Structure formats: structure tokens, C-alpha cells
Amino acid sequence: MPAKGVIQEIIGVVIRAKFPEDQVPEIYNAIEIPLEQGGRLVCEVQQQLGNGVVKAVAMGSTDGLRRGLEVIDTGRPIAVPVGPATLGRVFNVLGDPIDGGPPFGPEVERRPIHRDPPSFEEQSTQAQIFETGIKVIDLIAPFTRGGKTAIFGGAGVGKTVVIQELIANIAKEQSGFSVFAGVGERSREGNDLIHEMREARIDENTTVFDKTIMVFGQMNEPPGARLRVGLTALTMAEYFRDQGRDILLFIDNIFRFVQAGSEVSSLLGRMPSQVGYQPTLGTEMGELQERITSTKRGSITSMQAVYVPADDYTDPAPATVFSHLDATISLERSIAERAIFPAVDPLASTSRILDPNIVGEEHYRVAQEVKRVLQRYKDLKDIIAILGMEELSDEDKLTVQRARKIELFFSQPFTVAQQFTGRPGKYVPVKKTVESFARLLNGEGDHIPESFFYMQGDFDDVLAAYEASQK
């Protein structure tokens, strides 16, 4: 018989309920409140206050609640459906479908969203490059298969577009399964993404959406839902990993997860720490990130968008994410302002596997030479601004010309942005990327004006565009 209690107090989304002292719900248990207008409100127990009293955070709106209503302990944490039936569906934090499709019956397995990370013995640490088809990422900051990568950037520099392109590329080129967690972002963007994925076809019978699970806890949701929606998506991804699959987990935006934790922490009356963040910031981030890992059976490769408040990378939220990552992609406003998309800063982006033993000697050499040319150009910018290009040596003039071409060549037309730009998207394999930049560094493009390098795929596309203009 499930334990029953009554609501004592409601403050915003925090509910205080009293249960019999010998039947107090455990921490993280889901408790349900049957609503008078029909339906139920699920809350998660966060604190036990003694004398049978618990504090819980609501996963939905508390409109219409009042003191004295009955509360039922479910006896376990929030549990969400997992398995092949979840592919091509859209869920909320509780694992309820929100796409208008049929609900899931008892035949579908459900797993609790709170679980321990895999043990040390189970974890796998092989270093292998994961091809994305985006030139600047594959060359300068290659993703690790089964690793964690974050895309950092301020407001409006293109984080979500890069993530959308990655989902489309991976579904088409590698036919992998993806799980997308929309954490505290705009509902409109989520809606756009669903429609784009339904239209993007892998073959005649399959769309990108059919191979993707989507979980949303958007800006309009209470902080409890935004805090837990990442765990819901991760639980669904873990199922496929444990079945021996290689799965992709996209989280947009991990900063909103921190923000929701801060709101919940304040509502529960905890003392804030630096810059007003929750004192448990590191612990909460660790609980999520440590579960995103690869085992000997399968892998989870994760890509996370990280909003950087006021473009300040020393803010505790982005700084906490840094320590968990294998690769960092930094999007820069100054590059976006020049209409170079993706607006990746190659000198600020890093990857643990940019190592000749992993990516190969040629890839490593080309990447380092590209960085050297760009860094030299950056150093010369002050001299150019004061004295002009004429005062540079011939060698430096050539370096500047090549650096400008490299910057423009890092731009790339995206499939998901085709409706805005009118340019068909280009997927460039790693091999082609390395070869293209090697040819540029060797001087094969020195006679081509820099404008021909803008928004092209590989080096052959640049040559074709230039030759077409000469006819």
C-alpha cells in the first residue's frame, strides 16, 4: 500500500508535505498529487525535515494546488520509458509523450532517472576520432568517439545551428541513433528542430527524426523539470549503450541545467555561493557528466551547447563544464560579425586527441601549421593597423594572405541553414579536410582571390568556382 500524506505548504514550485513518520518517502522519490481538475502533478523529494515532513520540487505547474490535498508516494524515483519504441518520439521530463502519439503501456520497460555511473572496470577509454563533416572542427578540435565535447558561445553566435548540423550529418552519414535534450531553451527552436528532422531524409523510407529521441524541458517549464530533463534523456541513451550501440547525446543547453539548479537551490533555502550559484554546482554537474561515459559494451558520444553569460569564460558555470571535456569548440562573436559561419575560433578551440598517435602525423602537422599561420597573422594585426601591409616582409605578406584565406575557408554551408542561405549544405570527410588545408598551405591557392574561399566545401570546390569565373 503506497504511503499517503497531505500538503502543508506551497511556495512557488516547492511543496511541503507531511507523511506518517514510519512511511516517509526517500530522497529523490517521486510523489504524486492527484489534481481536482483531473490528471496528476509529479514532484521529486529533495529534503526530509523530520517528523514525517518532506520538501519536494514540482515537475509541472503548481496552479490549482491548495493545502490539505492528498499526496501519494510512488516508492521510487521518476522512471521513464526506454528501448526501440522511444525512437522517433518526443517526451517531457516524466517520459510522457508530448507529440500527440499514443502513450506507452506496461509492456515498455521503464528505468529510474537516478542511477550510478558505470564502475571503473566497465568503463572504456579508447581514443578514436569521430568524424563530423565540419572542416574547422575535424581539423582543429576533433571529437572523441565516446567522449564529451562542448560548444561554448554567447547569445546568438550559432551554438544551436552547429548542434542541429551535427545531428543531421550523423544521421545521414553514419546512420546512428541520437538523443536530443532541450534544456531550458526556446520552445520555438525545439519546434523548428522537430519539423526539420521530419523533413530531412536518410533514404526513401526513413527520416532523421525516426532515428532520434527528443526530450524537452523548455524555458517555460518549472525549474524542477529543467533540472531533471537532462537525466531523462541520459537514461534513454544509457539503454542503447548497454545494448551495445554507439549513441549520440546532444544537450542544448547545459548552462540552463546549472541555472535551474540555482533556482531550485534558492527555493529550498540553501545559501548561495560565488556569483549567486548553488553551493552544490560541482556535485550536480559531476552527477550528470560522470554518467555520460563509454563502457566495454557501447559508447555515448556527447555534444553539449554551453551559453557563456556576457561572453565571460571565467563564470563558474562554463568553468565547471570545462573540467569534464575531451574537446572544446569556442564560438566567437567577432567571427560571427564577419559572417563566417560556423563562427569557431580555431586558436581557442582544443581537443585532447589532436595527437599524432591518434589522428595521424599528416593531420597533426597540417592542424599545427594552420594554427601557426593564424597566430602569426594575429600577432601582425597591430603592425598592419598602424603601418599598413606595405611595411611587412614578403614572407609575412604571404602568411597574412594565406591566413585570411584559411579564415574564410573555415566557413562552410550547412544543410540545416540552407533555407536561410540558399546554399546547399556540404559534408567534408576528415581526409578531404586535411588534404584541402595541406594544399592551401603548400601555395596551391596563392593565385586565387580570397573571396573564392568563402562558403565552400573542399579545395576542389574552390578551384571549380575560380575556374568557372575565368571562363
UniProtKB/Swiss-Prot annotation:
One of its GO terms (cellular component) is proton-transporting ATP synthase complex. It is an enzyme of class 7 (translocase). It is a peripheral membrane protein. One of its GO terms (molecular function) is proton-transporting ATP synthase activity, rotational mechanism. Belongs to the ATPase alpha/beta chains family. Keywords: ATP synthesis, ATP-binding, Cell membrane, CF(1), Hydrogen ion transport, Ion transport, Membrane, Nucleotide-binding, Translocase, Transport. Produces ATP from ADP in the presence of a proton gradient across the membrane. The catalytic sites are hosted primarily by the beta subunits. F-type ATPases have 2 components, CF(1) - the catalytic core - and CF(0) - the membrane proton channel. CF(1) has five subunits: alpha(3), beta(3), gamma(1), delta(1), epsilon(1). CF(0) has four main subunits: a(1), b(1), b'(1) and c(9-12). Its EC number is 7.1.2.2. It catalyses: ATP + H2O + 4 H(+)(in) = ADP + phosphate + 5 H(+)(out). It is found in: Cell membrane. The keyword Transmembrane does not apply. ATP binds at residues 153-160. This is ATP synthase subunit beta. NCBIfam families: atpD. SUPFAM superfamilies: C-terminal domain of alpha and beta subunits of F1 ATP synthase, N-terminal domain of alpha and beta subunits of F1 ATP synthase, P-loop containing nucleoside triphosphate hydrolases. The gene is atpD. Signal peptide: none annotated. Its main location: membrane. SMART domains: AAA.
